[in-house]
Amino acid sequence: MSIKIALAGNPNCGKTTLFNALTGSNQFVGNWPGVTVEKKEGKFKGNKDVTIMDLPGIYSLSPYTLEEVVARNYLIGERPDAIINIIDGTNIERNLYLSTQIMELGIPVVMAVNMMDLVKKSGDVINTDKLSKKLGCEVVEISALKGTGIMEAANKAIEIASKKAEAPDRKSVV
């Protein structure tokens, strides 16, 4: 069974760094918006039946920019089996607008709170259990740059995608 997992989030939140770590790719990473303007595809290092899609960084699913059109069309048109929503742990509030839009799509979501190494270094704490309960999705602490938590995020996404694939289609039952 093949599984498609999309990486979605704001610009500069670590999507491509996570993509490179999960796939063994070497996509260019830059510290400014607009580096990734098209979707990139790679096979998950741990399971070749899993395809990871690196989507351009966007602030909203409203298609105003080319990046937003590419990301929105993929999420709505091709409907991946799961989404890893990467958010910048050093600026959660800015990221949650897109997160709520993504969750409204009805596609299983794992939220990966990235840059946790920086959050902890600054002495801040993010209550991921509380965030998970409030949002209604799995929340995992990661550092894409250091590689911590990334396999947990990927495996949770694979798990929820597999459960979705095994569930009967409600429309076909009626």
Residue map of PLM features:
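Conserved G1/Walker A P-loop phosphate-binding module
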Residues: 1-64, 77-78, 82
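Canonical P-loop GTPase G-domain recognition
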Residues: 117-169
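Conserved small/polar residues in nucleotide/adenosyl-binding loops
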Residues: 173-174
